[in-house]
A protein has these predicted regions:
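Positively charged n-region of N-terminal signal peptides that target proteins for export
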Residues: 1-4
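Post-BTB helical module
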Residues: 60-61
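Active-site beta-strand/loop architecture of penicillin-binding DD-peptidases
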Residues: 596, 600-620
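Hydrophobic alpha-helical transmembrane segments and adjacent short intramembrane/lumenal linkers
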Residues: 170, 583-584
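Primarily short, surface-exposed interaction patches in extracytoplasmic proteins
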Residues: 23-56, 67-96, 110-482, 488-490, ...
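Bacterial N-terminal signal peptides
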Residues: 6-17
Length: 709
């Protein structure tokens, strides 16, 4: 504990070369300063975080992990007055940028991999960030789409709420505009101006959308029906025969079309330059009736032409049939949701841009302009409305570029400021943070902490030689048992999951133990976005009877275990090469299962609207870090790591190894006292490498590692 305390409370010492040269965000900083002056704020801003702290902060916020030793060394070689700009540019292009911000949008959109279309929607968002798809286009597609997830991944947003008009009305208003209208589903909003009729008018945009399931493939998709399911007045206010379909309307304030605002003019000019590239891409194909008529006409024209002509007729007819847009007929577009998507994402809808600006500002700076971040109402005004509106208007003028928004914020003084000193007065701390003159303490997000441990421990690749670490583990297997003909077979083939004595003794059992609660299923975003063409199957099914479809479905089902056979489970020894490597937490099925590392450190379940990540500490978190496999594997020293070479051979340099270890794990160099303490830890180990593993374990478990500078 003494060594752990030294790590947690050790003083920070930096070479003079690691100076503070903040990047200039221009007008944003000036507008924020002017707004603070108008509010009568006279407090002195905290100094910018030092260069090493900035490199750690910006890498976590842009790439979703701590920087590697090589990255830090490269950063320090850049000229002091350029390194922050260069670092931001570097990590904006890092492949981790899309991974990290996909998790941000997964929280916002409540993406759940275990729900229909969830994994495809996550892949869609990841691709949108990678390509810098305009944010309004990304959202417009999600609101208006119909189809199945394999072909139209953005449909996951509608499927996430089971195509329920009431749930989608609440989600659309709160997720995309920060308007909590759900309360008005049952009664007029008690704290805001929205009425029950307003709620139903928004729900009516989704009233014709229905969820269906293919009888054979069990594929779930959405399409449109003729009549709306949303009726007015509500069921509890009128007789059934007095209700009629509700007329859709958009009750939210809107900038008047006659207003010619400068930021909208800039947007129009920017989009005009892009129109030529997009021209012709939106033309729809011929309808089913048109193509069938054309195919029939060609057949009639050539019937008298003999065998060769008949073959040509057949070939051309098949070619024409293949062009039929079966999906357009099956997955009908929603005119109502097309209209709603344009209204929600319009540049003249201030709620839309303001909300995303508020979300991203809160995520990066630590405090939102509006809190809670998705609760915009007259009685909950923004703390700095001019600064928020400046960012929102510039975001729109830059064609809703999400990358532009992130870069603008991380380049600002507000983002780059350090924390208030630990011994400062609490009221002063709160005032500085509310005025964005200091940044609040932020713990790493769960995924960032996971990937940072993997990065610090060199676990994205193997770090031991093949066969170097044989290990015997207990694996649970299921064994069939032939039933006794004199007794009924009551086994159903289920795995026995009662804790075994071996589990209780702490041995590693592959089936289920807390020791392995850090891993999960890895998602392949590219494969998820590769549409599978099932048009031929759909076309053939149209000619089949219901009985034929059911017979085909039963034939395609996997064979079930013999219900008359009993199964027992047993533990067997298995020798493995204990040389693991870990994949990124951002590529896991999400949310992770309950009890997983990510869930313990704040990843939400994404079930309810407005569900935030929590950053509270808990005993389970501490136990996961102290005893979990991820921390254990990261602490182990492998011969393929740089620090191994520093500690072995004819001339080991333990002082250099300690400095490098601090450099990699905490993104700083240790003080002389810390070096002395660290060498004592190394000397106390069974051998030097075990002692270094102890030191790395201590550093990974200290508060300094978990909290951002």
């Amino acid at each position: 504990m003494k060594r752990l305390a030294v790590c947690i409370f050790a003083s920070w010492m930096f070479p003079a070369a690691w100076c503070c040269t903040p990047v200039d965000a221009g007008d944003l900083d000036a507008i924020l300063a002017a707004e603070n002056a108008e509010k009568g704020v006279t407090l002195q801003a905290v100094d910018p975080v030092d260069d090493m702290g900035f490199s750690r902060r910006v890498c976590l916020d842009l790439a979703g992990r701590i920087p590697t030793g090589k990255e830090i060394s490269q950063y320090l070689k850049w000229p002091a007055d350029q390194r922050r700009d260069k670092l931001i540019a570097k990590y904006m292009q890092d492949e981790g940028f899309a991974n990290r911000w996909s998790a941000f949008f997964a929280d916002m959109l409540r993406i759940r991999s275990n729900e229909e279309g969830g994994t495809q929607l996550l892949a869609y968002v990841h691709n949108a960030i990678t390509t810098d798809m305009p944010y309004d286009e990304m959202c417009r597609r999600m609101i208006s789409a119909n189809g199945k997830a394999g072909r139209t991944p953005e449909i996951g947003f509608v499927l996430g709420d089971d195509a329920d008009p009431m749930a989608l009305a609440s989600a659309t208003a709160q997720v995309f505009m920060g308007i909590r209208i759900s309360c008005a589903q049952c009664h007029d909003h008690p704290f805001d101006k929205w009425t029950r009729e307003d709620f139903y008018s928004v729900a009516a945009y989704f009233g014709k959308t229905i969820r269906r399931e293919n009888n054979l493939t069990k594929t779930v998709y959405t399409t449109e029906q003729d009549k709306s399911m949303v009726l007015w007045p509500p069921e509890d206010e009128s007789e059934p025969d007095a209700r009629s379909p509700m007329k859709p309307s958009f009750p939210f304030p809107y900038l008047d079309e006659s207003e010619r605002l400068e930021f909208l003019t800039r947007l129009e000019k920017l989009r005009a330059n892009k129109e030529a590239e997009a021209a012709g891409n939106s033309e729809s194909g011929p309808s089913v009736d048109d193509l069938l008529a054309a195919a029939g006409s060609k057949t009639k024209q050539r019937l008298s032409g003999g065998f060769g002509a008949a073959m040509k007729v057949s070939t051309e007819a098949k070619s024409d049939i293949r062009k039929i847009d079966v999906n357009a007929e099956l997955y009908k577009r929603s005119q109502l949701r097309d209209e709603l998507s344009r209204l929600v994402t319009s540049p003249r809808n201030r709620y839309f841009a303001r909300l995303l600006v508020n979300r991203v500002w809160k995520d990066l700076v630590g405090t939102g302009f509006v809190e809670p971040i998705d609760d915009f109402r007259d009685s909950n005004p923004a703390s700095h409305p001019k600064t928020m509106d400046y960012l929102a208007e510039e975001f729109v003028a830059n064609d809703f570029s999400f990358r532009w928004l992130v870069k603008e914020i991380v380049s600002s003084d507000a983002y780059q400021r350090a924390h208030v000193a630990l011994d400062a007065d609490e009221q002063e701390r709160a005032a500085l943070e509310q005025a964005f003159l200091a940044t609040p303490m932020r713990r790493m997000k769960a995924e960032a902490m996971y990937d940072s441990i993997v990065t610090a421990g060199h676990l994205f690749a193997v770090k031991h030689l093949p066969g170097e670490n044989p290990r015997v583990i207990k694996r649970r297997i299921r064994v069939p048992v032939d039933p006794d003909p004199n007794e009924s077979a009551d086994g159903d083939g289920a795995m026995e999951d009662e804790p075994t004595e071996e589990m209780m003794q702490g041995e590693m059992v592959a089936s289920a133990v807390n020791y392995g609660l850090e891993k999960s299923i890895e998602l392949d975003f590219g494969a998820l976005l590769s549409a599978k063409d099932d048009t031929p199957m759909i076309d053939s099914m149209k000619k089949m009877t219901r009985e034929e479809i059911e017979a085909m479905r039963m034939k395609s089902m996997p064979q079930q275990n013999n219900p008359r056979r009993r199964y027992v489970s047993k533990l067997v020894d298995e020798t493995i090469d204990d040389n693991p490597k870990f994949s990124s937490a951002y590529r896991m099925a999400t949310p992770a299962p309950a009890g997983h590392f990510l869930r313990l450190f704040g990843q939400p379940s994404r079930v309810d609207l407005g569900e935030d990540r929590y950053d509270n500490s808990s005993m389970r978190q501490a136990l996961m870090m102290l005893n979990g496999r991820l921390t254990h594997e990261a602490a182990r020293v492998g011969p393929l790591e740089p620090v191994y070479k520093m500690m072995t051979g004819a001339n080991p340099d333990f002082r250099k190894a300690v400095r490098y270890t601090y450099f990699e794990i905490l993104t700083r160099l240790p003080s002389e006292d810390e070096i002395a303490e660290a060498i004592a830890v190394i000397d106390a180990g069974e051998d030097k490498l075990t002692g270094m593993a102890d030191l790395r374990w201590i550093l990974l478990n200290c508060n300094e590692f978990r909290f951002m500078p």
